[in-house]
């Protein structure tokens, strides 16, 4: 048999937990509602992000870069993309990664990234890769 002296504090604790749980879920729902409202009012988010079905129908080349009209070589793209990723990690500025890939890597930012990453000894190798994927 449970004593009433233990029952009182236990019952109080259970009620307190129920109230806290209800308040936490209300905060979560409010936050979710704010995020959904932001996403629904954002014109760029709805226009830029395709639905899942559309994303699956994209060609492999479209995922990487529309401006690359040359030979689709996954290893070359990975190598060139790695330069831009490393350059982004060096500077931590989103525009560095975007500008580095612009024009299928045929730009001054990509060349500057090669220089800043101290890859100038491999410049000819990267230049050939850019020519192959960007023809």
From Swiss-Prot:
Nucleotide-binding in keyword set: no
Predominant subcellular localization, coarse grouping: secreted
An MF annotation (GO) of this entry: neuropeptide hormone activity
Keywords: Amidation, Carbohydrate metabolism, Cleavage on pair of basic residues, Disulfide bond, Glucose metabolism, Hormone, Neuropeptide, Secreted, Signal
PROSITE patterns: CHH_MIH_GIH
Protein family according to the UniProt entry: Belongs to the arthropod CHH/MIH/GIH/VIH hormone family.
Name recorded for this polypeptide: Crustacean hyperglycemic hormones
Gene giving rise to this polypeptide: CHH
């Amino acid at each position: 048999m449970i004593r009433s002296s233990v029952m009182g504090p236990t019952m109080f604790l259970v009620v307190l937990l129920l109230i806290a749980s209800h308040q936490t879920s209300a905060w979560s729902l409010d936050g979710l509602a704010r995020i959904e409202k932001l996403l629904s009012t954002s014109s760029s988010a709805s226009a830029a992000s395709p639905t899942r079905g559309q994303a699956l129908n994209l060609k492999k080349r479209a995922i990487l870069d529309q401006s690359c009209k040359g030979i689709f070589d996954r290893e070359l793209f990975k190598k060139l993309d790695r330069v831009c990723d490393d350059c982004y990690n060096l500077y931590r500025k989103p525009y560095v990664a975007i500008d580095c890939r612009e024009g299928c890597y045929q730009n001054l930012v990509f060349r500057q990234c090669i220089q800043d990453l101290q890859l100038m000894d491999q410049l000819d190798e990267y230049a050939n890769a850019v020519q192959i994927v960007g023809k």
